[in-house]
Amino acid sequence: MNVVYLHYHLNHGGVTRVIANQIRALALTYTDPAHLRFGLLSGGSADNWKEDLRASRQMPEVLIGVLPRLQYDSQSGVEPVELATDLRRQLAEFGFGREDTVLHVHNHSLGKNAALPGALRRLGAEGFALLLQLHDFAEDHRPANYCHLLGSRDHGDLFEHLYPQASHIHYAVLNSRDYSLLWQAGVPADRLHYLPNAMPEVPHLPDQAAARRTLQDRFGVPCSGLFLAYPVRAIRRKNLGEALLWAALFPSDLQVGITLPPTNPAALSHYERWKQLAAQLRLPVYFELGGANGLPVAEVLAAADRILTTSVTEGFGMAFLESWMAERVLVGRNLPEITADFVAAGMRFDHMYDQLRIPVGLVGRAAVEEMLCEAYRQLVHAYHLPDPPPNVLSELIDERTHNDLIDFADLNEPLQEQILRRIVAHPPVRQEILALNPTLAQALAAPDFERQNLIHLNRQVVQRSYCPAVSGARLCRIYDKLLTQPRDVSVTGLGPENRLLTHFLTPNRFRPMKG
């Protein structure tokens, strides 16, 4: 069996790490490793991938092909037929035939390369077995990506184009939510696979006291008080304002550490504003603790008393697994539609909240209503869709401001900033918010034995349900099934209505900072 993984780039990041873990997991569990060969195709950008491979344990030989037409494209200059030709030629150079090769493609429909969906459809029509793994959706608050794919098509035509259907074209998803979405959109259950990410063992962490001293020496983080590490690249949907809110609510009890700045220029302005605000308000928040000029992530985790997450959306939600493997309790924002699978496996998230309630009156109802309506209109318009009707906007306002409270994550950055300034200027506001959200103080005050029991429980579940061996077994079953399917060269689509777009743009899924 030959397995060829395909992604736009091999830079450090989530999907690249997933691919590396999948290769390791499959090599670990495949019953006939002598007859298992790996290929890897990307657009050519690969920050130290080969060095990572050489340093990695349990990594087999991988043939690497570079296809420049596979890179991110800002304009639709590449024709699908050209990219299909490149892919076909590279597979032939690997010596991989159509009959015993699975092409495992990550995020083909995300809108990073407008030619890729059409190229894959051509290969599918020629009988190549395809596993299309979806981590993220262009339909989910990514209008620029979606419109790049849309071009001159209408929405129904694009839906047909993006999600090809045939007996030898299967889909893999990270969670039950996405499984349900694709099934409801028309993907047959026998071509749809639940494929959560594998969670490798975390290397042994340094001594906590030594790591705290290093943080103090390098970044001025005091050794006193609790240290909450937020190991994240601070893009907009990571909801950095809420991390600052933790610091504002407990200014003398804790410090918050953010590891990485965004690399996307569009996110930098928000990030720099949060840095300026933290300095102005003298909040105990420390930035860029990781990366090239910072500390290794293991040292930041070692220094932490808790791991924090405030993200408003995730694909798989690796953050909900990693903290327990690092033997640290996770606090902050729960994402129930993501963590539902983890809870079903036996995990508990006792010190997390689904909402962080804020009195609407702190910023004014008129400002909140105007912000929600305008932000939702802008999102809908960005997808080239008509203005939402007034009753939809009214329902959005009523649902988000029930009992004159609003979730902090439903505010945009300017309104979040107003809340932070009010807390610092008027200490009674701090107590009002803490009274509405008792989970925050409870998460910090939980006794050691309780935290250790929770860590032990969740760590066992992660090791049992999300280990590389389990992931490898899943991959084996999926690939074996794909290779035994009849090669139906009649490739169809899912129908004229983009049900995924309809789902993701419903008001109850809207967040101002998801983009």
Descriptions of predicted regions:
Residues 1-515:
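Catalytic cores of nucleotide-sugar-dependent glycosyltransferases that transfer UDP/GDP/TDP-activated
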